[in-house]
Amino acid sequence: MVREFCSCRSVALLFVATLFCGQAMGQLVEKRTFVSQKKINAFDNTTFCTAYLSDGTMYTMRDIAISDLRNIDHIVFNPTGSSLAVLRQKKPVAIFSFRDRNKKLFELKEKRKGLKEKPLVLAMCYGSDARNFIVSNSLGEIVVYDTREYLPQAYIQGDAPATSLALSSNNYFIASAVGKEVVIWNFQTREKRKSIPMPAVVKEVAFSPDASLLAVTTDDKRLTIIDTKNWDKVDIFDKLGGMLTSPSFHPEGKYVSVVRDNKDIIIVNLKNSVVEQELPEAQIGVMGTRFFKNNQNSEVFLLSNRPYQIVFWDANGLNPFYGKIMGKEVDAKMNEWVKMMQGESMEDYAIRVNDESRLKQQQLFAQEVATELAGDRISID
């Protein structure tokens, strides 16, 4: 039954694609730039809340110093937008307010006694729901903190230090970059789930918003996409023409952006495994890309930088993931259709809802949704 339904949906999707045939492919368009008087070495954001580093000091997009701290190596935004985690060499991670200048909220000091050496933090990240904050250190540990008091909740001992971390949106998995391996940990049980060998040293890891995929960049100029259901490598992009960094998933999961050689932005279409768009820059100095959705109106943007600019790209022109949209719409309609109607007897229900009628109704809904999607797209164009 499932296979038949999937094929029916594919037919309907083909119908949509036919209607769109001949229309121009969607593209990112530069929307707005914020010029800085200072050179941008790194940045982070949560939606439109953006901070950047310049010569070890953190600033807002308006070149306003967030604190007087110097020698900052790395910053990570709390998804709430209210604070940032700040990493300095040989210093405890500190949490600073984004709203109040120089306001330190927490400091994650090591309080354990009897350690042979003081652990140094190497990587850090927040969970997408802002409830958890994790760091990796030089002892090979991954430390889990709550975000109310920033107290350690668990110490996960690995075989070697992790240099990049990602926490899945469903709080099921931690992905860590450990040499030539991606090590997956079960976030709930704190147990190792899987070690995935890679052909070269792993640079960065990033989960898709729905946690179904994991993007991995390695220092052999590859972008690898991994399915989190079975941890199989489902796509490898090894001909993008340079060293790849800063992978970021589009909110719908259909596209991934990467930076090539700290200069050009590449948008990869995961649906058909091709480059959707290249955004060449005039000079080296692009430090990252980050897709995000404006939660107020569901518009999608890509954030990047130039040496002296923060750049917002309008990503709403990218073609939607019609298969995923159709699946959700058809499933929602079917969930309503299979409900017993008011006054309907069990006998009547059994006649109305059976294997044959269910499949037929799925086909009708798939065609209906495909027609609606095609109509919406044509009206937009």
Q: PLM features: what roles do these ranges have?
A:
Residues 59-61, 93-96, 142-145, 185, ...:
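WD40-repeat beta-propellers
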Residues 45, 79-80, 128-129, 169-170, ...:
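Residue-level detector of Asp-centered blade-edge/turn motifs that repeat once per structural unit
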Residues 26-40, 61-64:
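A short helix->beta-strand "capping" segment at the edge of beta-propeller domains
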Residues 49-50, 84, 133, 174, ...:
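Hydrophobic beta-strand positions that form the internal "hydrophobic ladder"
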Residues 56, 91, 139-140, 180-182, ...:
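Short coil/turn segments within WD40 beta-propeller repeats
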Residues 62-64, 98-101, 147-150, 187-190, ...:
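Short loop/turn segments that connect beta-strands within beta-propeller blades
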Residues 34-39, 66-71, 109-121, 156-162, ...:
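WD40/WD-repeat beta-propeller blade N-cap
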Residues 41-43, 50, 75, 124, ...:
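Hydrophobic core register within WD40 beta-propeller blades
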